[in-house]
Amino acid sequence: MRYNQFSYIPTSLERAAEELKELGFDLDLQKTAKANLESFLRKLFFHYPDSDYPLSHLIAKNDMDALSFFQSEQELSKEVFDLLALQVLGFIPGVDFTEADAFLDKLAFPIHFDETEIIKHIHHLLATRCKSGMTLIDDLVSQGMLTMDNDYHFFNGKSLATFDTSQLIREVVYVEAPLDTDQDGQLDLIKVNIIRPQSQKPLPTLMTPSPYHQGINEVANDKKLYRMEKELVVKKRRQITVEDRDFIPLETQPCKLPIGQNLESFSYINSYSLNDYFLARGFANIYVSGVGTAGSTGFMTSGDYAQIESFKAVIDWLNGRATAYTSHSKTHQVRADWANGLVCTTGKSYLGTMSTGLATTGVDGLAMIIAESAISSWYNYYRENGLVCSPGGYPGEDLDVLTELTYSRNLLAGDYLRHNDRYQELLNQQSQALDRQSGDYNQFWHDRNYLKNAHQIKCDVVYTHGLQDWNVKPRQVYEIVNALPSTINKHLFLHQGEHVYMHNWQSIDFRESMNALLCQKLLGLANDFSLPEMIWQDNTCPQNWQERKVFGTSTIKELDLGQELLLIDNHYGEDEFKAYGKDFRAFKAALFKGKANQALVDILLEEDLLINGEIVLQLKVKSSENKGLLSAQILDYGKKKRLGDLPIALTQSSIDNGQNFSREPLKELPFRENSYRVISKGFMNLQNRNNLSSIETIPNNKWMTVRLPLQPTIYHLEKGDTLRVILYTTDFEHTVRDNSNYALTIDLSQSQLIVPIASN
């Protein structure tokens, strides 16, 4: 374990003493440091009628227990404080450590003993994470140190778990959206699942916009998947044009219906544990799946601003600008009289994507988004540089396949009976519009590109993204964070994992940082919390996070690739082609072992290199035919210890998100020896070699200059490391699988790897 503490708010002595008193700690500025520490420790054992017993189970020195120490005349020292602090946080002498000083250095322990600062040290200790993954104060509240009185209690600028999660209100409303996506002449209704604590105060809301939450249709999804085996189409030379089109919602009328009290209820919904954490701290949770999902009406428009509007309507309802009904019969309306109108959206992948789309509408009431692994341009999710390009791990998927997966209305047999024919018509229109044949950018994709509206974002934004995420690739977050207005508060966490959540990792206090931010933005708490704009997980060692200023630098270093002419054959034998098509993982294994059709260039680094931004391959290329696709991957190659990309569970249920509520495991990325790590990758149709909107011909056996931008990253390589460049054609995980007999030739003498670099 290593501390990377970003959530602690430095506090004055007076404020620290006041907050400790509010929690019931009987500390006195006039007492000695030793007396105050003893009083603090005894309070921790509030379950015991006699605190001597648990105090005797701690040691103050290697040869003295804590009870004996406090009964003695010995003075409090750094050695004693450190040893007791470690034990209070759950670290066991002789098990987790033998030498406290060395262990504290390894932990990067954030508290440095000064006898005159004991009150502030105790305050800081309470806000510091235990071995279990919870802060000490959260652990104490979890055990019942504070009663669940359904009111707010704060410590160090963060809300504590004092809302009763055993008496939650669970209700359903149906919000009227200014849409008619299935063109049936009726405004679409959007089902909203609400979970909120009982409280006399207006509550802020965490909203998870999740098209998955009302169920998914995996059977329809699998039937809709596309075969990747097809020839790369030779496209006609042309220029692509698109236009920015404002989304125009339909008109709605003020509702004059009576207020209903008898709301639909529910017992369970698959919740997001970060939401659960805030539910226990006085934040309502709502789950919304949007148009075309079970319980709602309309068509699943998948990614456009009509879908975004169906979520926006819910924020409008929370602020009194839209109507919600108690049921589909629309006999009574219901108002969000429990809400304070301020909303933060949460969720990963599609969920985070909807958060970005919502933010670009500038809707009033949306105070903040926490968008994890989020898409900012749907074209860049299903296409790349004029190619059909599947997200990592999902060859054959496309946006209409995702529509089939998430159109959960068809999971309700009655809805299927009444609406499936119309749904199939609209789905066919969507399949035509996305133009899988060419892989080109068009108006359909432009209407699903949130980057063009990034200037309209006015809420605070928090993004998290894995630099090993080949599903929602790093370019998605790179482009949105660099398009954000300079006037807003923005925060980016870049981790070394893949397509994963990070709120329950041991090495970063993400959960507590979000608590401080949300208390600021949604509860109006003046806590003086300041979070860096960007926090990056160092790839060279375990559990080390650093502040960075920017994602993407303008300083570059050009690395020569050699002097040879390299030939890349596209064609595979029939058996090999079928085997790779059947299992793309077998292809990846062969590729990284140098056994696929590929060209390899190894670059031995003569100095440290901190990559920050978009690596570009500038290549001199020719194709034996009038077509060609180019794939590239950059590896950190050679045996050494590296971070894994999937977090593993360190404990099973050590994190309590309330008071015995929604427990979850503590996780972390492992640090193990392996043979390589992918730094970046990229794909291009050579007919789109200059830009996305220009389709050009490929002259047979004529040299072309190609600039292939790879996925942005921040990655630290050290002197003596090997940077491996892999150039090839068909990628069996991502691209179409064209087995035609053509070859690419690369002139390395006129090719470079252009690397954006930053100082370390």
From Swiss-Prot:
Q: What is its main location?
A: cytoplasm
Q: Sorted alphabetically, which Pfam families does this protein's record hold?
A: Peptidase_S15, PepX_C, PepX_N
Reported EC number(s) for this entry are: 3.4.14.11
**Could you tell me the keywords of this UniProt record?**
Aminopeptidase, Cytoplasm, Hydrolase, Protease, Serine protease
**GO cellular component assignments:** cytoplasm
Q: Where in the cell is it found?
A: Cytoplasm
In the record, biological process GO terms are: proteolysis
In the UniProt record, the signal sequence range is none
Q: Which residues form the active site?
A: S349 (charge relay system), D469 (charge relay system), H499 (charge relay system)
- The parts of the chain that form a coiled coil are none
Its domain of life? Answer: Bacteria
Task: Write out the catalysed reaction.
Answer: Hydrolyzes Xaa-Pro-|- bonds to release unblocked, N-terminal dipeptides from substrates including Ala-Pro-|-p-nitroanilide and (sequentially) Tyr-Pro-|-Phe-Pro-|-Gly-Pro-|-Ile
- Stated family: Belongs to the peptidase S15 family.
Subunit info? Homodimer.
Instruction: Describe the task this protein carries out.
Output: Removes N-terminal dipeptides sequentially from polypeptides having unsubstituted N-termini provided that the penultimate residue is proline.
Name of the molecule in the record: Xaa-Pro dipeptidyl-peptidase
